[in-house]
From Swiss-Prot:
Interacts with PJA2; the interaction is direct and recruits PJA2 to centrosomes. Interacts with OFD1; regulates its activity in cilium assembly. Interacts with PRKACA. Residues 1053-1056 are annotated as: Mediates direct interaction with PJA2. SMART domains: WD40. GO terms for biological process: cilium assembly. It comes from the Eukaryota. This is TBC1 domain family member 31. It comes from Homo sapiens (Human). Residues 999-1020 have a biased composition (Polar residues). WD repeats lie at residues 33-74, 75-116, 117-157, 158-200, 201-248, 249-296, 297-334. The gene is TBC1D31. Residues 989-998 have a biased composition (Basic and acidic residues).
Length: 1066
């Protein structure tokens, strides 16, 4: 078996010499992936999948490395690093270079093996995807997780459909049937549905299996033609469903060793048209068994108890099997090599008996039983039977005994003749012949019982005494020795048992049952009387060997005696290691071909023959160390010569000293249960067991006490280390404190210097800030002055415009009055002319004229009233704006004064602090006191200002009330004038005196209100306004007086004009 380590290579050859898989295991190559980092580790393969041709496979490990293995071209390539474990793979897409991989983050990605680029990225699952099934056309794919299955279009990589289920019913598997358009969905409640791929219409549902054989399905497999469905679970039963008839047609029971089925897959055949007959069944023990569904026979199996299989994939053409092993490696098997024995042609009908060489013939060798078996011909339904014919030779006596008959049709005598002729058995059939010679019962149940007892206490630390490189070989040796110790207690105390068993364990490491039974048979037959003087070497057996050596080579024995070399040195090392230390593998196998084919005394004679054949180098040895080295190492000795010498000794040794007279004949192990082995001094073994138990208990007590002492010592050492660490830490802290103190002093000096520089910078900034504030104040005052001057100019312009408009209106009114007077004059003449003719018409006309005049006067008075109101409103607005500006200016002056005062105090404080730095604390307290006083003064000043603001607000409200009263008086005056005009129009000769009185009252009322207003405004003006405010107020009063005088003149003129028509009428 070849083994390939991928290492850190991204490409390379899979095997370096042409693979020749053995029929026994069929392994082409074993692929492992070890990293060559600082801490080497094994990267475990998790999934494997074949492409459509079957000559390429893809595999991913638990770190996300994905490799493509070309079995036809003998190349591997690293095609992708996903940086996370893959949970499922698919390599049979429409585009042959693309593959699908399901990752641990629940996503599915499509990569290209040629360009090594990402083709698409599909998301939608919320749990791990454990299955990817691709349609036969490669157009669709189904990804399955525990909670959902999703159908994808591989042309657009878009999800077409999604299968949702209840949370209580999980999904086991959803997959396409081969060569059809049907989807099969299998759920955890054993329900199986078939769906149409295009329409997702439910085609049928398989019925429930019988209750007597009901199992929970977990794994499924379908034949290539899609007709048969195999299902299995946590049982050794397999259910076979016919999907055409939709019924369960067969239940196959696996061997009792199978308790659960982990994986199922049919083995394709090129000549079965898709109706596969061989089914691979992977069970819980890691062994994949291939059975024929028709005959229910086990054809072959892969994997073992030590190298179990976790998952497998079979190529579409059925040539290769790729298996992920439990240790994380990848094994590739050749199906042709595994089925070589099955596909062998039938044995020939005629057999030829060949004569042995003449010097080997004897009368007992001429009689042979030839049985022609049954010949199977596929074209014929009948089986022809052949009778057994016996070829006999007329010789005296019946030389063949029943004791020479062996299982499986073998004969011990014929095997001995064959062995003498060729010197050894054929390598291909050696194990088979050994099993027949030793008549091994293969007690699986009894051996499993011994194995189930676990590792024996005596062999728990076997690797310390015998450090074996192969861990598998060490485990097999440990299990075999433990089984022997559980079989008989003597073997737990036998120190040389590992040496005796090791060559057989190495030879039968893949079949532990055969290994155990071979060693047990060897101990019962070829190790007779070895344990009678336990724990000493078998003195009686060594005495037999010494007697035979004394008979055949006295000189060599005398040489041993002269140099104080006993049989425990020249015989016992060979026996306890069964010659494995002094012979090569081929020599050892050839020797044991002869040992197992002869009487148990043959082993003892072999020890004598080995010494006799090595007499020349032994006679040249004089030191005991040289003798010990000779019997523990390989020597340049022909094993064929030794075997011939053994046969010579067996024939020429006298009966009285021949070991066969003292040893029993061969006895095979019993069938079903192993025999009891008690050929040892039981009281010694029991005493040793008790003593060993007592010593073990004493050792445990000693170990506990030593552990306690070690714990106490560890605590003391830990406390000492902690104390030393504490003292060191304190010393370091002290030094660090001194360093920090020096650093603090330096930092304080730097801080003082920085503070001085900062104080100087602050002073400079304060001076700059004062200059800037002063400049800003001057700029703001100038801006306010400019705005106020502009406002005054605007007010002057507005007043001028108003005066001009009033003059124009008055002139227009005068012209209107003159025109009216002319009209009246003309009317007067007309009235006087027509008075006598039409008094009534004249009176009517006069009344109409009087109404028109009254309406005109009302309109003019209304317009005049609006003009007066507009003037008063503008005057009030002007006064309000002036007052607000004055208040803001006063507040700005106060804020500036306070800031100047505060800056002056801060400057005084800075000068005082610079003069007396030593009294910093006292000055700070004084500053805080002064600051409190300043704050209190500011609060008081603020309260005063607020009080003054409230007084001003009150005076403002009073001014507004006075203005409202003035408006009301003017309105009342106008109403009185209008009423007087109306009354005058009705009766011009009466009530002239009251009107004059009212005129005086109305003229006096506004003046009084204005005087009151002036008297109310005067005190505040004298208190808070500056000279410019006084000038503004004087200008405003002058303007108001001019407006009042203008109104009086206009009123008097209007009154005079209103009186003229009445006088003329009178």
């Amino acid at each position: 078996m070849q083994s390939t380590d991928l290492g850190n290579k991204e490409s390379g050859k899979i095997w370096h010499r042409k693979p020749s898989p053995a029929t026994r295991d069929g392994i082409i190559v074993n692929i492992i992936h070890n990293t060559s980092d600082y801490h080497p580790k094994v990267l475990r393969f998790l999934n494997v999948a074949f492409d459509g041709t079957g000559d390429c496979l893809i595999a991913g490990d638990h770190q996300g490395n994905i490799y493509v293995f070309d079995l036809h071209g003998n190349r591997f390539n690293l095609v992708q690093r996903t940086a996370q474990a893959c949970t499922a793979l698919a390599f049979n897409l429409r585009r042959k270079s693309e593959f699908l991989v399901a990752l641990a983050d629940y996503s599915i990605k499509c990569f290209d093996t040629v360009t090594k680029e990402l083709v698409s990225w599909m998301r939608g699952h919320e749990s791990s995807v454990f299955s990817i099934s691709v349609h036969a056309s490669g157009k669709y794919a189904i990804t399955t997780s525990s909670d959902t299955a999703q159908l994808w279009d591989l042309d657009t990589f878009q999800r077409k459909r999604k299968l949702n289920i209840r949370q209580s019913v999980g999904i086991q598997k959803v997959f396409f049937l081969p060569l059809s358009n049907t989807i099969l969905s299998c759920f955890k409640d054993n329900s199986i549905f078939a769906w149409e791929c295009d329409t997702l219409f439910c085609k049928y549902q398989l019925p429930a299996p019988p209750e007597s054989s009901s199992i929970l399905y977990k794994v499924f497999a379908v034949t290539r033609d899609g007709r048969i469905l195999a299902a299995g679970g946590k049982s050794n039963h397999l259910h076979l469903w016919c999907l055409e008839a939709r019924q369960l047609f067969r239940i196959i029971q696996m061997p009792t060793k199978v308790r659960a089925i982990r994986h199922l897959e049919f083995l394709p055949d090129s000549f079965d048209a898709g109706s596969n007959q061989v089914l691979g069944v992977l069970s819980q023990d890691g062994i994949m068994r291939f059975i024929n569904m028709q005959t229910c026979k086990l054809l072959f199996e892969i994997g073992s108890l030590d190298e179990g299989i976790s998952s497998s994939a079979i190529s579409p053409h059925g040539r290769y099997i790729a298996s992920i092993m439990e240790n994380g490696s990848l094994n590739i098997y050749s199906v042709q090599a595994l089925t070589q024995e099955i596909n062998k042609p039938p044995p020939p009908l005629v057999k030829v008996i060949e004569d042995l060489p003449k010097n080997k013939l004897s009368s007992s060798d001429l009689k042979m039983k030839v049985t022609s078996g049954r010949v199977q011909q596929p074209a014929k339904s009948r089986e022809s039977k052949m009778q057994t014919r016996i070829l006999k030779q007329d010789l005296t006596g019946d030389f063949e005994s029943k004791k020479n008959e062996l299982p499986d049709g073998l004969n011990k005598k014929r095997l001995q003749i064959l062995l003498k002729g060729y010197g050894e058995y054929p390598t291909k059939y050696r194990m088979f012949i050994w099993r027949s010679l030793l008549q091994l019962p293969e007690n699986h149940t009894a051996f499993s019982t011994l194995i189930d007892k676990g590792t024996h206490v005596a062999f728990l630390n076997l690797q310390k005494k015998y450090p074996i490189k192969s861990r598998k070989l060490l485990r097999v040796l440990q299990r075999t020795l433990s089984a022997l110790a559980h079989w008989s207690v003597i073997f737990s105390d036998t120190p040389y048992l590992p040496l005796l068993a090791f060559p057989f364990v190495k030879l039968f490491q893949n079949n532990q049952l055969i290994c155990f039974e071979v060693i047990a048979t060897l101990i019962i037959n070829w190790c007779q009387h070895w344990f009678e003087y336990f724990p000493n070497p078998p003195i009686n057996i060594l005495s037999m060997i010494e007697n035979v050596l004394a008979f055949h080579d006295k000189e060599l024995l005398q040489h041993f005696i002269d140099h104080d070399i006993t049989s425990q040195l020249y015989a016992w090392p060979l026996l306890e290691t069964v010659f494995s230390e002094v012979l090569t593998r081929e020599e050892w196998l050839k020797l044991f071909d002869n040992i197992f084919s002869n009487h148990p005394s043959f082993l003892l004679m072999t020890v004598v023959a080995y010494n006799i054949c090595s007499r020349t180098p032994l006679l040249s040895c004089n030191l005991k160390d040289d003798f010990e080295f000779f019997f523990h190492h390989r020597n340049n000795l022909d094993i064929n010569v030794v075997i011939r010498q053994v046969y010579h000794l067996m024939e020429t040794t006298p009966t009285d000293i021949h070991p066969d007279s003292m040893l029993n004949v061969f006895v095979a192990l019993t069938k079903g249960q192993y025999p009891v082995f008690n050929q040892y001094p039981k009281f010694i073994v029991d005493y040793q067991t008790q003593e060993r138990e007592r010593i073990r208990n004493d050792e445990l007590d000693y170990l506990r006490e030593r552990q306690t002492v070690e714990d106490m010592q560890a605590k003391v050492d830990q406390q000492r280390v902690e104390d030393e660490a504490w003292y060191q830490k304190q010393e370091l802290l002290r030094k660090a404190e001194e360093t920090r103190r020096e650093m603090l002093l330096q930092e304080e000096e730097k801080m003082i210097q920085q503070r001085q520089r900062l104080a100087a910078v602050k002073r400079e900034l304060k001076v700059k800030e004062m200059h800037l504030q002063d400049a800003a104040r001057r700029r703001f005052l100038k801006l306010q002055q400019d705005q106020q001057e502009m406002e005054l100019r605007r007010l002057d312009d507005e007043i001028g415009r108003k005066v001009y408009m009033r003059d124009r209106e008055i002139a227009a009114t005068a012209r209107d009055l003159e025109m009216r007077q002319l009209e009246l004059e003309s009317q007067k003449r007309l009235y006087e002319k027509n008075l006598t003719e039409n008094q009534e018409a004249l009176a009517k006309e006069m009344r109409a004229d009087a109404d028109a005049y009254r309406r005109k006067v009302d309109l003019e008075e209304h317009m005049f009233h609006k003009l007066i109101e507009a003037g008063e409103t503008q005057s009030q607005k002007t006064q309000k704006v002036i007052k607000e500006n004055l208040a803001k200016a006063e507040q700005a002056c106060l804020n500036t004064d306070w800031q100047i005062q505060s800056l002056h105090k801060q400057k005084c404080d800075d000068l005082q602090r610079n003069k007396c730095y030593q009294e910093v604390a006292k000055l700070l307290r004084e500053n805080r006191r002064k600051e409190i006083e300043i704050i209190n003064a500011m609060v008081e000043e603020e309260a005063k200002k607020w009080k003054e603001a409230e007084g001003k607000e009150f005076r403002l409200r009073s001014a507004k009330k006075a203005s409202a009263l003035s408006d009301a008086s003017r309105k009342w005056f106008l109403k009185q004038e209008i009423n007087a005009a109306v009354e005058h129009a009705e009766n011009p000769c009466h009530k002239e005196e009251p009107r004059f009185q009212n005129e005086q009252d109305s003229s006096c009322l506004p003046r009084t209100s204005q005087l009151n207003d002036s008297s109310e405004m005067d005190p505040s003006t004298q208190i808070s306004l500056n000279r410019r405010a006084v000038e503004w107020d004087t200008t405003g009063q002058n303007l108001i007086k001019k407006v009042r005088n203008l109104r009086q003149r206009l009123t008097a003129r209007a009154r005079h004009r209103c009186q003229t028509p009445h006088l003329l009428a009178a």
